[in-house]
Curated annotation (Swiss-Prot):
Pathway: Amino-acid biosynthesis; S-adenosyl-L-methionine biosynthesis; S-adenosyl-L-methionine from L-methionine: step 1/1. Homotetramer; dimer of dimers. InterPro entries: ADOMET_SYNTHASE_CS, S-AdoMet_synt_C, S-AdoMet_synt_central, S-AdoMet_synt_N, S-AdoMet_synthetase, S-AdoMet_synthetase_sfam. It comes from the Bacteria. Binds 2 divalent ions per subunit. Its cofactor is Mg(2+); K(+). K(+) binds at E45. This is S-adenosylmethionine synthase. Keywords: ATP-binding, Cytoplasm, Magnesium, Metal-binding, Nucleotide-binding, One-carbon metabolism, Potassium, Transferase. ATP binds at H17, D177, G178, K179, R244, F245, D253, R259, K260, A276, K280.
Length: 399
């Protein structure tokens, strides 16, 4: 059956979006704890609304961190520094409700885990089970240099640029909340050929006109990010399509940690297991196994074994080995998917402690992932974005 040209859309949000404020607070707390106690267990959830932040969750650690201080510093860094923005780092209330990790959950994870991944024997790694059941997906494709789908790649770059021009005062009337959305047209062979539609909604000072915003965002944001050859006379632009976006951030909408899981991953281009990332330490396979699955998929594509690859991992609580490993290349594989699964098993340790060791995940590296995507990042060095296994995979595949 002949494929037709089609459109695909992905969105991103700025760091000032209410849900992303929560992700950044949760990961800032996680980083602060990991910087003092690498073996802490952290499951930290945040909610924000007008004038209020609530931090809740389960944290087991030998250290102390000043959670309200971290919350205020994070909000200040995002840019909510004045009451007229509807949310102010200095004056908002901060409530905390923290418990220890459940003993029933800890029982399945604890054996021999203490700070020893680097020196652990294979038997000890095998003894450490997953902290929960669940399924996780990782994806990569050769549409962009960073091996990510083009729609989410452009949406993230637009969102990041919105923040840059706000913070460097290029467009000083912008405020922290904002969203971007990019629709890409694909040809009959599934290759991206043009940008069909760009949507940007950004919070702003009440006195600026829509005409100014429209002109400035096209000039300083869209032109600076989207390659000219991808846009044409038919490309549609919707800039603040409601005409006004003054009330935003937590005053406009309540926010929660883990509510932007598609923005965090592949923009809907690949499947998602449902687990969120932010606020969770690496013993939570929701996070660590999703990072490992991306690492596997990216190395498969970087090795030239497929044009696109989706990897699924699944776990049972208290069991170290994945209950399943699946690879789908959507008909683009240069070797069979059975061969790819065998290559994955032989080259990647996908047991929870093995992932932590392989990707060095007991470090305070997570706040930087909490806005603008966890994957395809070229601005920060993330271990799961490396392609250091590609050469070995290619050689073992006989290519």
């Amino acid at each position: 059956m002949t494929k037709k040209r089609h459109l695909f859309t992905s969105e991103s949000v700025t760091e000032g979006h209410p849900d992303k404020i929560c992700d950044q607070i949760s990961d800032s707390i996680l980083d602060a704890i990991l910087s003092k106690d690498a073996n802490a267990r952290v499951a930290c959830e945040t909610t924000v609304t007008t004038g209020l932040v609530l931090v809740a969750g389960e944290i087991t650690t030998s250290t102390y961190v000043d959670i309200p201080k971290i919350v205020r510093e994070t909000i200040q860094g995002i840019g909510y520094t004045r009451a007229k923005y509807g949310f102010d780092a200095e004056t908002c209330a901060v409530l905390t409700s923290i418990d220890e990790q459940s003993a029933d959950i800890a029982m399945g994870v604890d054996q021999a885990l203490e700070a020893r991944e680097g020196q652990m024997t294979d038997a000890e790694i095998e003894a450490i089970g997953a902290g929960d059941q669940g399924l996780m997906f990782g994806f990569a494709c050769n549409e962009t240099q960073e091996l990510m789908p083009l729609p989410i790649s452009l949406a993230h770059k637009l969102a990041r640029r919105l923040t840059e021009v706000r913070k460097d005062d290029t467009l000083s009337y912008l405020r922290p909340d904002g969203k971007t959305q990019v629709t890409v047209e694909y040809d009959e062979n599934g290759k991206p050929v043009r940008v069909d539609t760009i949507v940007i909604s950004t919070q702003h000072h009440p006195d600026v006109t829509w005409e100014e915003i429209d002109r400035d965002l096209k000039e300083h944001v869209i032109k600076a990010v989207v390659p000219a050859e991808l846009m044409d006379g038919e490309t549609k632009f919707f800039i603040n399509p409601t005409g006004r976006f003054v009330i935003g951030g937590p005053q406009g909408d309540a926010g929660l940690t883990g509510r932007k899981i598609i923005v965090d991953t592949y923009g809907g281009y690949a499947r998602h297991g449902g687990g969120a990332f932010s606020g969770k330490d690496a013993t939570k396979v929701d996070r660590s196994a999703a990072y490992a699955a991306r690492y596997v998929a990216k190395n498969i594509v970087a090795a030239g074994l497929a044009d696109k690859a989706e990897v699924q991992l699944a776990y049972a609580i208290g069991v170290a080995q994945p209950v399943s490993i699946s690879v789908d290349t959507f008909g683009t594989g240069k070797v069979s998917e059975d061969v790819l699964v065998e290559l994955v098993r032989n080259n990647f340790d996908l047991r929870p402690a093995g992932i932590i060791k392989m990707l060095d995940l007991r470090r305070p590296i997570y706040k930087q992932t909490a806005a603008y995507g966890h994957f395809g990042r070229t601005d920060v060095d993330l271990s799961w974005e490396r392609t250091d296994k590609a050469a070995a995979l290619k050689e073992q595949a006989g290519l």
